[in-house]
Amino acid sequence: MRDYIINDKRWEWDVIEPGTKGDELTLEITSETVATYASDARNFNPRYIDASEGEFAMPTTIFREGPLRRHSMAQSAGYTALEVVEENSRQTPFAKCTARWFKPIKVGDTITSCAHVLEKYDKRGSKFVTFRVELTNQDQDKVAEYDYTCIFEYAKGQNLS
């Protein structure tokens, strides 16, 4: 985690800018990665455990093959994510996630994902940030995307217990 701490500038809601991008991540989809994910998800369907070239991966593999990587977005903006700052670190709790699939991910694909800040907003005094992760294959076809929303600040006076 120390690699993510680039300075003491905290990536708080007021400095987050929509459009901020993180780094790209490219991964090969192999029979082994499909089987490992299926096993980890406790889905022992032979379709995934014994997948061969050209066969489909589980749809939810998008969350492993295209992880959120908020830390890289914070770093690209010159800040440190709140979860890893040295003093007074804190979580930004999950609020919701919406995923959309456009094409299947298959054994033999090369998947590249990139995340960016989609929007930030205030709702009833609480402050939210939505991130979008987009996944494309080796043909530059978008295979999936998901929006992941976190609560950066709770409304003042809200009882959190």
Which role does the model predict for each range below?
Residues 1-96, 157-161:
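Hot-dog-fold acyl-thioester-processing enzymes
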Residues 1-17, 96, 101-161:
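HotDog/MaoC-like acyl-thioester-processing domains
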